[in-house]
Amino acid sequence: MKITWLGHSGFRIEIEEAVLLVDPWLSGNPMFPIERRDEAIAGATHILLTHGHGDHSGDAVAIASELGLPIVGIYDLVTWLQSRDGVDGIGFNKGGTVTLDGARVTMVHATHSSSIMGEAGPVYTGTESGYMIAGEGHVIYASGDTDIMADMGWMGEYHRPDIGILAAGGHFTMDMKRAAFAARKYFDFRTVIPCHYRTFPLLEQSAEALRQGLPGVEVLEPEVLEPITI
């Protein structure tokens, strides 16, 4: 399994036979070297969106159209993109599971907001979500944009993820201290990878508080386009 950060909240996850592009915002992303776009999307099989905000869905339609990939996500968002842009899609909802080239992806709750920019302004695109991605003997919890929530209790107990990809930059999501608290209280991670940080000055620039709050857990600060092999 390989997990590669695309900057901000974007990831390339190679698991089983799937290559998932999670929240691929590349164009205009100050963390992403746009000259390496082809490398980042090569071989992708699916695009997985946590919600509609432009810093998560920004390049989804362009990549889906270019490579002929389905966009996978909450039903409201996916059907809207299908109607507007003619892309392929797999829409489902919280509690549902889809199998994507051997990887089992279950949609779980998050607490944030979700809209996408339409011609007349923001369009509501269903609720925000996270994902449990299972394969190769591991379960990855990709939190999406969220704060701490009580639902993390049953999510951790039921799905038992060993890898956490946690939005932890503060301001729009939980910060590093809150993410560490959530991980300690609700999960038993072996590895935690922070995201949604370093992109803009108002977000946290370091994961040191996360590391200090999770003794005994491997906290990996990702570098853009440098694969993490699990």
Curated annotation (Swiss-Prot):
Q: MF terms per GO, please? A: hydrolase activity
Q: Entry's Pfam families?
A: Lactamase_B_2
| UniProt xrefs under SUPFAM superfamilies | Metallo-hydrolase/oxidoreductase
Keyword vocabulary terms for this entry? Hydrolase
Q: Name the SMART domains on file.
A: Lactamase_B
Does the keyword Hydrolase belong to this entry?
yes
Record family assignment = Belongs to the UPF0173 family.
Instruction: State the protein's name.
Output: UPF0173 metal-dependent hydrolase Rsph17025_2229
Organism name:
Cereibacter sphaeroides (strain ATCC 17025 / ATH 2.4.3) (Rhodobacter sphaeroides)
